[in-house]
Every structure is written in structure tokens, then in C-alpha cells.
Amino acid sequence: MMCNKHSKNYYKKYKKWCDDYFYLHHRNEPRGIGVIFFDYKKENWDKDFAFVRDVGIVFSYLFKEIIAKKIKKRWKKKDKLIQNKKRGRYVEFNLLHDRGTKFGLQTGGNVEAILMSLPPTANWE
């Protein structure tokens, strides 16, 4: 595992951070696929850079593999419903919990720019 190359504690630490940060408390459900999350790494610049670089390299490789595997998959109506439900969960998280969104809205930021990441369609059940 790439994280272990840098520290035996990184995967466990950043997986927990991901699970905790991206949890929808009002629904009692996790978001995402359970990978890692971190921000504001300020331990050692060179080591932090090497770790972030390796995360990017691994992500790029894995993303290409996923796309290659799924690129020819035909979408069904059921798939679109699932996608829009997940988009709805993203909207909930972004507006209720995301630190960046909250900060931008509370400090008079450009609302259109802040909300630009919201999906064009979403569903709630």
C-alpha cells in the first residue's frame, strides 16, 4: 500500500479522517468509497510533498484503470437515479458540513463561485 511507504500510520490515520469528515450525521450514513483524506499537512515539507506526489501518481493510475474498465458501460435509468441520489448526498454534505463552503458563505465570498461545484441535477429520497 502506497501510504505505508511513507508511514505505517498514514493509511489508518487518513482513512479515519476521511470516514469522520465525510459522514452525514443527519442521515447516519457515510459518503464516498472509504479512501483517505487529509489537508493542511505541515509535518515536514519534503516528506509531505513526497507523500502528496505519490497520492497523485497512484490516483492517476487507478483513475485510468477505472475509466478503462467502465468507459463502454451503458447507463440505465436505474444508474441515473443512483447517480442523482449520490449527487443529493453531495449537496447535503457541501452545504451542511464542508469547511470551505461554510467559510466562503460566512465571509461574504462570491456565492455563485462557491456553489459552482453543485451538480445540475440531484434527487432526495
PLM feature spans:
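A domain-level signal for the structural core that forms small-molecule/cofactor-binding pockets
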Residues: 1-125
